[in-house]
Regions:
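Bacterial Sec-dependent N-terminal signal peptides
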Residues: 1-22
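Carbohydrate-active catalytic/glycan-binding domains of CAZyme proteins
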Residues: 20-485
Length: 485
């Protein structure tokens, strides 16, 4: 009865809860954004998970137009996520959790080289660094924890303490869990502002949120904002679900923004997109969401198509649980991808991040004569993928990781493969010359290839696949949006 009464109140007063409009900065799977203001420059990075080589760092001068500048290409420490990118003095720091601990890498130049990872041996996830006006460094982690660091920020310097309990949202709200995480710290006008996430990263559409607290000391007491939640999805009817994991940043002209991630309800398998919306500082020293402010448009994302004829692999490519820079080569003959394993479950994968609800990917493939196969997939994880791979004799058309249909390969060892993602329904086509196409499968449902079904907080990605003992060749990879803009 109480839950029904609360839902009635929400329905009656929904205009009071209507969220601000937002700017879509990066469509596709760009979760857990961390934004650094460095003079007139802005840098942003996101979770890397099992996609190697490592964290991709972007650069902007206006928060709207972003270009990739480097990968943090270091030793793999396990699935790495929720980073915090900072600059102290003339050194860049990237803190991140992986393998049950927290790590840091450093660089004098944002483009690298970056150091080897240092294990801080600090518990918790989602690290957030703060440097006090006196120069002391502290690392916050999930659950309201804080750990003092050494003066160089490369080791702990004391015990971890719990200093913040979070903001108590109404019990009737439909969330995944309390899950106090994503602490991001800002020093502003005599206060430390702690921006956190609560409610769970996925699960119900209304789960995630951004909340704020402030204190005169990193050890508290922390006072929760009267404007909480700063960002939240109040209804499953909203376009953006599970909005959370926010970082606040001062943009050009003194306008402040909160940058966060969210799922597109119409393309959940696409992952968590990066968005931002304006905030303002109040006369009583809090920041809050801004309503009815005209918003700028973000620039287009860099293209994903690749002819593989350059001197090095494009920025858009990653390996799955292994660093592609160690084995993928490009040149006048295209991409050479050494085979591994016997199927997409254990084979070699090279992936890119889709940006659209509907898109077409196409590639030209040359398969070795024997003991090898190659293909084009939409890949979430080993438990969830669809697409086609083939050797010189047969096609295997995957509806999912456990079910495939085998049919004769009448195209031979050289062919073109096309995947058409039509709002989470997949069509698979092949061609011998790139002009006349044969449809192998239609309307394979891929809408359930996402975290709420398979876990891991990943996204469905186009993937080149090479299996067996020899190298397969790929040319003319094309990615085309099917969305009318």
């Amino acid at each position: 009865m109480i839950r029904q009464f609360f839902r009635l109140l929400i329905a009656l007063f929904m205009p009071c809860f209507t969220a601000s409009a937002q700017v879509l900065l990066m469509p596709g799977d760009y979760p857990d954004p961390s934004v650094l203001k460095d003079g007139d420059d802005y840098y942003m990075t996101h979770s890397a998970f099992n996609y190697l080589p490592g964290f991709l760092i972007w650069h902007s001068r206006d928060l709207l137009h972003w270009e990739p500048v480097c990968r943090v290409d270091g030793a793999w420490t396990g699935s790495a996520w929720a980073p915090d990118l900072q600059k102290v003095g003339d050194t860049y720091y990237l803190y991140y959790p992986a393998g049950g601990t927290n790590w840091v890498v450093t660089a004098k130049d944002i483009h690298g080289p970056w150091s080897e990872p240092i294990d801080l041996k600090i518990r918790g996830i989602d690290p957030g660094l703060i440097v006090t006006p006196e120069g002391k460094r502290y690392l916050f982690t999930s659950g309201g924890l804080v750990t003092p660091l050494t003066d160089d920020g490369l080791a702990s310097a004391g015990e971890t303490e719990k200093v913040y309990e979070g903001w108590e949202y109404p019990q009737e709200w439909d969330t995944e869990c309390m899950c106090l995480e994503s602490p991001k710290l800002t020093w502003h006008d005599g206060y430390y502002y702690l921006t956190s996430a609560e409610g769970g990263t996925a699960g119900p559409a209304t789960s995630h949120m951004v909340v704020c607290a402030r204190s005169k000391s990193v050890y508290g007491p922390w006072e929760n904002s009267p404007y909480n939640p700063i960002v939240h999805t109040y209804s499953a009817d909203n376009k953006w679900w599970s909005k959370g994991h926010g970082t606040i940043v001062e943009g050009p002209g003194g306008q402040w923004w909160v940058v966060y991630h969210a799922y597109n309800k119409d393309a959940y398998s696409l992952g968590r997109n990066t968005l931002m919306e304006p905030i303002e500082w109040t006369s009583d020293g809090w920041y809050r969401s801004v309503k009815d402010m005209p918003l700028p448009e973000a620039g287009d994302m860099p293209g994903l198509s690749d002819d593989f004829t350059g001197s090095q692999l494009g920025w858009q490519w990653t390996g799955w649980k292994e660093n592609i820079s160690a084995w993928a080569t490009v040149g006048n003959d295209g991409l050479s991808l050494p085979g591994k394993g016997s199927s997409p479950l254990d084979g070699r994968l090279m992936l890119t991040t889709a940006n659209d609800e509907q898109y077409t990917v196409e590639v030209e493939v040359a398969i070795p004569e024997k003991d090898s196969e190659a293909g084009l997939l939409l890949f979430y994880c080993e438990k969830a993928f669809a697409g086609v791979n083939c050797d010189s004799k047969n096609f295997k058309v995957y509806q999912d990781a456990e079910h495939y249909t085998e049919m004769p390969n009448t195209m031979g060892r050289r062919l073109h493969i096309r995947l058409e993602n039509r709002c989470d329904y997949l069509d698979i086509l092949v061609s011998g010359d790139g002009n006349e196409w044969q449809t192998l499968a239609e309307k394979i449902r891929i809408a359930d290839f996402h975290h709420n079904r398979y876990g891991e907080f990943l996204a469905l990605r186009p993937a080149l696949y090479a299996g067996g003992t020899a190298s397969s060749q790929f040319k003319k990879f094309s990615y085309q949006s099917r969305v009318k803009h």
